[in-house]
A protein has these predicted regions:
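Switch II of P-loop NTPase G domains
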Residues: 79-141, 161
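Conserved G1/Walker A P-loop phosphate-binding module
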Residues: 2-75, 79, 88-93, 97-99
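A structural signal for isolated positions on well-ordered beta-strands in alpha/beta enzyme cores
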Residues: 33, 150-151, 180
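Conserved NTP-handling cores and scaffolds of large molecular machines
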Residues: 49, 53-56, 146, 201, ...
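Conserved C-terminal guanine-recognition region of P-loop GTPase G domains, centered on the G4
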Residues: 125-176
Length: 207
């Protein structure tokens, strides 16, 4: 994966004296947003892949969410929710750092999305097939702004319950949008989801 550096074209290379260590190279940073509905697994996704201790702004569920944030049976076991964002970082070969920002899932915090998406190359939209309607807002948001995104169907129990073509049809996404299974708890699965998004974003930038 090659992202452009900000080096000045034609500038002479600096000579490093013998025996002196090469100066550290500033990493190339890439911002990615992890989105989706309430209780879909965004915090878990970032936590499974981050090289650093994830920053999570979670708060206890309150009566304010009743009738507003429907997570079906998930509400029975979910006692906290992200109220601002989740943040994590993963370092890849070639001095490439991926900064991961998770959106708050509750509807009343959607006003923060514009700030979180600023500067991002794209988004991973997590999908819960038991509550497809919960990710409609995310899909509509990124499509309306022509921001590259992928749909990662989260297999909560490690079992794929719905066909990917059926999910694509239900969400009415364009054929070029990647739709695939993932497991937000599994580092390798989340890494593959991020690689798929970066590849899509690079292809879009290259025309």
């Amino acid at each position: 994966m090659a992202f452009p550096r900000s080096d000045v074209a034609g500038a002479p290379a600096q000579q490093v004296p013998v025996g002196q260590a090469e100066p550290p190279v500033a990493p190339i940073t890439v911002k990615i947003v992890v989105a989706g509905g309430f209780a879909v697994g965004k915090t878990t996704f970032i936590g499974s892949i981050s090289d650093i201790e994830p920053l999570s702004t979670e708060a206890a569920m309150t009566e304010h969410s009743v009738g507003v944030d429907d997570a079906g049976g998930v509400s029975d076991r979910k006692t906290s929710t992200t109220v601002a964002m989740d943040f994590g970082r993963i370092a890849l070969p070639g001095d490439l750092w991926l900064y991961l920002f998770g959106t708050p899932g509750q509807d009343r915090f959607h006003f923060m999305w514009d700030d979180l998406i600023t500067g991002a190359i794209g988004a991973v939209v997590l999908v819960d097939t038991e509550r497809l309607e919960s990710c409609f807002d995310a899909v509509d948001y990124f499509e309306a702004r022509q921001i590259p995104f992928v749909l990662a169907v989260n297999c909560f129990d490690g079992v794929a319950k719905h066909d990917l073509d059926a999910v694509r049809e239900a969400l009415a996404v364009r054929p070029e949008v990647p739709v695939f299974y993932t497991d937000a708890r599994n580092r390798q699965a989340t890494k593959q989801a991020l690689i798929t998004l970066v590849s899509l974003a690079m292809a879009r930038m290259q025309g």
